[in-house]
């Protein structure tokens, strides 16, 4: 009898250990100088994605609004040292909290700790922001990743869709990050749903990566999820006239044209792209946030935040919402 109980106990422990290893992982958090801080158990997600902090505790939806604002912001290698600068941190909180979802590029950190601290700083103002991310670096040992930061009261993410683009090694230095969202507030059957493809083009290989992004955009529309509103946004390191094959995708339009998106005002590098036939939810309103003017920063203070400016575009909260003319 005791032998049977012992066997059953060992078997249960073995099955439990296998289940834990298959469904959870240990996330080691370290300080900026590499010192151990703590270990956190996090659930594994499909395609290596990392769940957002509030996935199991969604806040109440905000009242329905006519539109939402999407943005992209290249953080220019944001690390712990820069986030530790009170002026930089305050500026980021003021910028990011203006939007419903922001595609962030070029975060430089060994784990998600930096992104968690940034989210916590925003939420300390009374907001309910969350994020999703997953491994996107294709090569090298430097930890660079992209993420989607969003207001959890106005948007919800389908965690099963969060993944980095599967491409042959060497296609991208930082593989595009993909996630699908739905607006909260309107009835689910009427709410705008969309797929974001967050990109960071390597300036040393811009022509090749831009050509490959044409394939990514086309493939996203045939991913099997049935989503036709594909929005590709990020740092393209080029304007629409120099997009190569990506610029020749039929009906592809850019939210901003002829406007610098760098803090020094020298070039257009960042943008938001979509198919104007499919994404009729675009309201026609978009722009580039001038950090110096909007936040009353000096040129150097703005450069301390990033070499890039946030680019934004507005979309209807409702599926097939009224569209404005796109030039």
For the regions a protein language model found, what residue spans apply to each?
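Divalent cation-coordinating acidic motifs and surrounding scaffolds
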Residues: 2-327
């Amino acid at each position: 009898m005791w032998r049977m109980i012992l066997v059953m106990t060992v078997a249960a422990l073995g099955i439990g250990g296998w289940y834990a290893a298959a469904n959870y992982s240990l996330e080691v958090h370290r300080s900026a100088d590499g010192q151990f801080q703590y270990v956190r158990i996090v659930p594994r997600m499909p395609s290596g994605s990392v769940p957002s902090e509030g996935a199991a505790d969604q806040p109440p939806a905000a009242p329905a609004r006519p539109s939402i604002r999407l943005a992209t912001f290249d953080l220019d290698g944001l690390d712990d040292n820069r986030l530790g600068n009170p002026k930089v941190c305050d500026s980021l909180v003021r910028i990011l909290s203006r939007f419903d979802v922001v595609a962030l590029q070029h975060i430089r950190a060994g784990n998600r700790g930096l992104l968690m601290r940034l989210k916590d700083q925003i939420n300390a103002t009374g907001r309910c922001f969350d994020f999703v991310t997953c491994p996107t670096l294709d090569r090298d040992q430097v930890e660079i990743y992209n993420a989607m930061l969003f207001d959890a009261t106005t948007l919800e993410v389908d965690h099963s869709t969060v993944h980095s683009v599967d491409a042959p090694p060497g296609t991208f230095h930082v593989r595009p990050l993909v996630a699908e969202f739905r607006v909260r507030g309107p009835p689910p059957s009427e709410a705008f749903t969309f797929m974001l493809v967050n990109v960071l083009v390597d300036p040393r290989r811009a022509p090749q990566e831009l050509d490959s992004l044409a394939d990514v955009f086309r493939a996203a529309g045939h991913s099997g999820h049935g989503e036709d509103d594909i929005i590709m946004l990020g740092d393209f390191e080029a304007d629409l006239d120099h997009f190569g094959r990506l610029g020749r995708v039929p009906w592809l339009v850019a939210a901003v044209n002829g406007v610098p998106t760098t803090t020094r005002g020298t070039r257009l590098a960042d943008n938001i792209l979509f198919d104007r036939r499919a994404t009729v939810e675009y309201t026609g309103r978009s722009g580039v946030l001038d950090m110096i003017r909007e936040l009353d920063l000096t040129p150097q203070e703005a450069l301390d935040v990033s070499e890039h400016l946030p680019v934004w575009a507005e979309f209807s909260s409702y599926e097939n919402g009224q569209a404005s003319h796109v030039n």
